[in-house]
Amino acid sequence: MRLSRGLYPRFVTLEFDMKTIQTLPRVLSMAAVALASVLLAGPAHAQSCGGDINDDGLVNSGDLATLLSNWGACAVSAPTISQVAPNSGPASGGTVIYIGGTNLNRATSVTVGGVAATVLAAYPTVIVATTPPSATGGAKTVAVTTPGGTASANNAFTYGAATPSWATLLEAAPDPVVVTSASLRAAIAASGFAWRVRDTATQIEMVLVPAGTYTMGCTASNTFGCAAAENPTRQVTITNAFYMGRYEVTQAQWTARMGSNPSNFQSASAQVPLAQVPSRPVETVSWTTVQGFRTATGMRLPTEAEWEYASRAGTTTAFNNGSSDDNTAVNIAWYNANALSQTRPVGGKAANGLGLHDMSGNVWEWVSDWYGAYPAGAQTNPTGPATGTNRVLRSGSWGYSANFMRSSYRGFNTPAFSGIDIGFRVARNP
């Protein structure tokens, strides 16, 4: 609708939408009151001219025209972020941060890693806020939202490595002497979780296995080829980081939870003094019996794919020490060439590239999967066949040759079977 009136010194022509028309009487009334107050106050030259919008020395229809022509929401400039300080803090949150930039004073939301922060103060060029807790550590995006839009600063704030609620921190960052691969250290850091922790309830030490992709299956040694069950090889992706016991579960750890010790090797020997017997791996435990320990502790068995991924620790060779030479198995495993027909205290051989010990030899280790032929093609987080007769065993033991120490070797037995060279290690989600 077009409205023209000649009641003022200047002719005013304006365009209105329906909403403006509905509010026009109130606006005109307010304007009339304002103009009347100006007139009653005396000559134009004596007033402050606070209403002189167009700066012509008069408060009149021209000013009203300017007001009405700009009726509606005011434009708001988009925010920007130039810096965040400090740029790091604990995963527990509570760090006071200063977000510098422009057009920040009308902030409606501030987030760190997608989680709302607590805003303490907001000014045009700086926001003061406290960081929220983070379920994971690592670099996070800081974002500020105003009526003018959202500004984001990628990786602007880094949380320290998070320790799971069930654990006690031992080492946040991987020891480069143990985790020698820079890519593995980077993957552990990127996960946002601490590298080495201790389960508070059981005192079982665990290390983080980061997410990743590897080739699962046959890797022959210089002496031994692969069994048919180790083929076909295929790409396997583990999408989530998980913790794995640094050592096989010991007799002491089992007894503390289950109340009795089923192991065959409960006595001292010429090689194992009495004080070290509790640190021998528990054995003579069936897959079925292990479920009781799992339930009592909140732990789980690793899947077969997780186990091999953790054992390899980035290697593509027969053995997890980066070699395919059978003579090097003696450095990482207790097997028939050096064990003297008995288990040995856990951790006595060199760790692999993640800090895991005895992933070859000492005792066979139950995993969660039913045993079956490998499917062809790439897989993500495989869990094995849905049903079966036997459960998978990995790692070889003190009674077997170097062939069985290879990372890809697969064993199996019925869930009810327990042998004097069969134990396990645990896994747990963060």
Locate predicted features:
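Alpha-helical segments with a strong preference for the paired helices of cellulosomal dockerin domains
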Residues: 53-75, 103-105, 252-255, 259, ...
